[in-house]
Amino acid sequence: MTAGRHWSYDSLKQIAIDGCTENVEQLKLIFVEEIGSRRRSDCIRTIEDLIDCLERADELSEYNVEPLRRISGNMPQLIEALSAYTKPENILGHPVNLYQELRLAEELRQQLRIAPASQNAQPSVSELAAAVPPTAIQNYATPAAFTDHKRTMVFKKISEELGRYWRRLGRSAGIGEGQMDTIEERYPHDLKSQILRLLQLIEEDDCHDPKHFLLRLCRALGDCGRNDLRKRVEQIMSH
């Protein structure tokens, strides 16, 4: 039963993914305008792919779950969960535009100085944050400076909410399958450590131009269908 339970946006998506029995080709016809192109449509083979596509197009988000309502006809649990879902408060006070946020990420990239983290046998949020020496971070007047505290908050938020599909983020960020296999072998039963190590690899990969790390991370989160987390990161950085 779903009555009285608070449902997160991620939970709604998972219910849709697990419970959908409708033909994906039929669903693609329903969302043909939102998908926008034949090329994108050809890349959609599962309900999960469709959700990713809608999120990338900013047609589906934690603030707009209407597309999930349109596919919930044969899923009673999803219907109930949607009726109990409360969208988060929009702290910006106005609708969020994907392209405006990408420009914000570009502006943040110009302001940040990020040093690569050292490798740790057992990565943790605190260890990864401590890997950047204070002297490596300039004291910007802007609140968007990437301080140790904000870095810890970003890593903590992603490690807690990214979930078991973390390899998608790795692929979107250009991390090789072999590197991700190594992460799984090193931390076979520790999802949080897997994600933290992935973030560390993404950061290390940008050591030639550390300013690119945050922009690359935000873009990768968007590309892998986690616009909700990308927004969280940008909110952390904008305060």
UniProtKB/Swiss-Prot annotation:
It is found in: Cytoplasm. Residues 1-105 are annotated as: Death-inducing. Keywords: Apoptosis, Cytoplasm. Changing I71M: In strain: G130 and G140. The keyword Plastid does not apply. Changing P143T: In strain: G02, G130 and G140. GO terms for cellular component: CD95 death-inducing signaling complex; cytoplasm; cytosol. InterPro entries: DEATH-like_dom_sf, Death_dom. Pfam families: Death. GO terms for biological process: apoptotic process; defense response to Gram-negative bacterium; extrinsic apoptotic signaling pathway; immune response; peptidoglycan recognition protein signaling pathway; positive regulation of antibacterial peptide biosynthetic process; positive regulation of defense response to virus by host; positive regulation of innate immune response. Transmembrane segments: none annotated. The keyword Cytoplasm applies. Residues 151-237 form the Death domain. One of its GO terms (molecular function) is CARD domain binding. Changing K87P: In strain: G125, G130 and G140. Its main location: cytoplasm. Interacts (via N-terminus) with Dredd; likely to bind Dredd simultaneously with Diap2 to form a trimeric complex. Interacts with imd. Component of the IMD signaling pathway and is required for the host defense against Gram-negative bacteria. Interacts with Dredd, promotes cleavage of Dredd and is necessary and sufficient for enhancing Dredd-induced apoptosis. This is Fas-associated death domain protein. It comes from Drosophila melanogaster (Fruit fly).
